[in-house]
Amino acid sequence: MDKIVIASRESRLAMWQAEHIQARLQALYPHLTVEILGMTTQGDQILDKTLSKIGGKGLFVKELEQALMDGRADLAVHSLKDVPMTLPDGFALAAVCEREDPRDAFVSNRYQHLSELPAGSVVGTSSLRREAQLRARFPQLAVKPLRGNVQTRLKKLDDGEFDAIILAAAGLKRLGLAERIQGELAPSESLPAAGQGALGIEIRADRADLSALLAPLNHPDTRACTAAERALAKELGGSCQVPLGAFATLADGTLTLGGLVAHPDGSVVLTASASGPADYADALGRAVAKKLIDAGARPLIAAVLAEPR
């Protein structure tokens, strides 16, 4: 093998992520030519509706998977939080790279913290998960949908459409925009999405050669944490259409996982947590999901999915 092609969305953040993997591969394997195939996905094209209305985050992935299947690309680089909890047959996650900041970030030109926002202030977010947690903590705020790439969202804030917006801290930091962050929200304030802040590298399952090549990019601690998070989300049918959070930390071989399911209006927020050995990440995810189910997650999810949005 003397050449590898990386499939990537064409947004600045996605291209940064692809170029980051490109640079790491070239450093590991100087004889390799590593190219990037930029692609526009359905999720990038449909900007007038929230993700929960148009089919969810999988819309950012399908075209890249097609490029892998067609042989136009060898691997695809994704924000792991955008990758469906169950991959289509024939695909595999070859590596999960070391996580950037997993937290949500508060961005505003006028205020330092969410608690400073006056009643009626307009806060923009693309995520039902963030919306539900915002509404639960700050029912006096007006939460409005916010789509587009990072630069588009910041421009909408700067143009006065919003008093504040909530974005993933990792994306801002990767783009050199950390100075726009007024503060990161602790997981206790805004529980992140499963996989948030981590990059996943997807390949065709029959490419054992690539699996070995990519092994040095895999970060075991991040893989264990995100495996627990994704197992929880999978057990609950995780999608963009239901506010669902999952975040794990690892210390001394023990994983601690927190999970959340909520109604988008913040009227109901269910939380659960548990700890277990890192070697049993999937089982821990299922255990925390069961706690949420025992607390009423199934009827809550069914009610949310039945509501027109």
Curated annotation (Swiss-Prot):
Functional pathway: Porphyrin-containing compound metabolism; protoporphyrin-IX biosynthesis; coproporphyrinogen-III from 5-aminolevulinate: step 2/4
Enzyme nomenclature, EC number: 2.5.1.61
GO biological process: protoporphyrinogen IX biosynthetic process
Entry's Gene Ontology molecular function annotations: hydroxymethylbilane synthase activity
Gene3D superfamilies: Periplasmic binding protein-like II, Porphobilinogen deaminase, C-terminal domain
Residues modified to S-(dipyrrolylmethanemethyl)cysteine: C240
Lineage: superkingdom: Bacteria
InterPro entries: HemC, Porphobilin_deaminase_cofac_BS, Porphobilin_deaminase_N, Porphobilinogen_deaminase_C, Porphobilinogen_deaminase_C_sf
Pfam families referenced in this protein's UniProt entry, alphabetically: Porphobil_deam, Porphobil_deamC
Co-factor: note: Binds 1 dipyrromethane group covalently.
Keywords noted in UniProt: Porphyrin biosynthesis, Transferase
Cofactor: dipyrromethane
CDD domains in the cross-refs: PBP2_EcHMBS_like
GO cellular component terms, semicolon-separated: cytoplasm
Entry's family note: Belongs to the HMBS family.
HAMAP family: Porphobil_deam (MF_00260)
Its job: Tetrapolymerization of the monopyrrole PBG into the hydroxymethylbilane pre-uroporphyrinogen in several discrete steps.
Quaternary structure note: Monomer.
Name by which UniProt lists this protein: Porphobilinogen deaminase
